């Protein structure tokens, strides 16, 4: 789910006259109060998070990834989506910087992600990679809840990016 905070959707087509530029990722990683040292040991580290997010970027980005527990996840989901349960990932997309840099926060609820990975028989790393790619796409304006066409476009991007990272299709 994406929460747009004054954000406009990112353009989806490249202008052939634009000069290619190196994309930059300014990444911060945070841990909520409920995340114990034992849980932190199971989470992807900053370098790996960046490796998973970078292929999903179509513009430079300033992103914060925050790992939270069930209470914070529920509070955020209730406060912003009016749903009284924790969800796997929330994306807060903000207005882009003047130079076009995407700015956003990705909040992952560890207990939900762990339960989903277990229930779906997926490696935990594969599920975190999928949700980070999913959240990064949301931060750039992609939204699977607006139409079937948008959902198909976003899903295809996720599958392609994850395949390049060596992960199987998360929807199969």
UniProtKB/Swiss-Prot annotation:
<keyword id="KW-0255">Endonuclease</keyword>
<dbReference type="InterPro" id="IPR002036">
    <property type="entry name" value="YbeY"/>
</dbReference>
<keyword id="KW-0378">Hydrolase</keyword>
<keyword id="KW-0963">Cytoplasm</keyword>
<dbReference type="GO" id="GO:0004521">
    <property type="term" value="F:RNA endonuclease activity"/>
</dbReference>
<dbReference type="GO" id="GO:0004222">
    <property type="term" value="F:metalloendopeptidase activity"/>
</dbReference>
<dbReference type="Pfam" id="PF02130">
    <property type="entry name" value="YbeY"/>
</dbReference>
<feature type="binding site">
    <location>
        <position position="134"/>
    </location>
    <ligand>
        <name>Zn(2+)</name>
    </ligand>
</feature>
<dbReference type="GO" id="GO:0006364">
    <property type="term" value="P:rRNA processing"/>
</dbReference>
<keyword id="KW-0540">Nuclease</keyword>
<dbReference type="InterPro" id="IPR023091">
    <property type="entry name" value="MetalPrtase_cat_dom_sf_prd"/>
</dbReference>
<keyword id="KW-0698">rRNA processing</keyword>
<comment type="function">
    <text>Single strand-specific metallo-endoribonuclease involved in late-stage 70S ribosome quality control and in maturation of the 3' terminus of the 16S rRNA.</text>
</comment>
<comment type="similarity">
    <text>Belongs to the endoribonuclease YbeY family.</text>
</comment>
<dbReference type="InterPro" id="IPR020549">
    <property type="entry name" value="YbeY_CS"/>
</dbReference>
<keyword id="KW-0479">Metal-binding</keyword>
<feature type="binding site">
    <location>
        <position position="138"/>
    </location>
    <ligand>
        <name>Zn(2+)</name>
    </ligand>
</feature>
<keyword id="KW-0862">Zinc</keyword>
<protein>
    <recommendedName>
        <fullName>Endoribonuclease YbeY</fullName>
        <ecNumber>3.1.-.-</ecNumber>
    </recommendedName>
</protein>
<keyword id="KW-0690">Ribosome biogenesis</keyword>
<feature type="binding site">
    <location>
        <position position="144"/>
    </location>
    <ligand>
        <name>Zn(2+)</name>
    </ligand>
</feature>
<dbReference type="GO" id="GO:0008270">
    <property type="term" value="F:zinc ion binding"/>
</dbReference>
<dbReference type="GO" id="GO:0005737">
    <property type="term" value="C:cytoplasm"/>
</dbReference>
């Amino acid at each position: 789910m994406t929460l747009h905070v004054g954000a406009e959707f990112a353009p989806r087509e490249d202008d052939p006259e634009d000069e290619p530029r190196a994309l930059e990722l300014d990444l911060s990683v945070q841990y909520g109060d409920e995340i114990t040292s034992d849980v932190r040991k199971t989470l992807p580290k900053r370098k790996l998070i960046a490796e998973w997010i970078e292929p999903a970027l179509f513009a430079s980005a300033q992103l914060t990834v925050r790992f939270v527990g069930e209470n914070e996840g529920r509070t955020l989901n209730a406060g912003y989506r009016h749903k009284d349960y924790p969800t796997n990932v929330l994306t807060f997309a903000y207005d882009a910087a003047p130079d076009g840099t995407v700015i956003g926060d990705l909040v992952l609820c560890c207990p939900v992600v762990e339960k989903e990975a277990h229930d779906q028989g997926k490696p935990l790393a594969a599920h975190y990679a999928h949700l980070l790619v999913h959240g990064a796409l949301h931060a750039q304006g992609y939204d699977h809840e607006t139409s079937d066409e948008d959902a198909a476009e976003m899903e295809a991007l996720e599958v392609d990016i994850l395949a390049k990272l060596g992960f199987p299709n998360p929807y199969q």
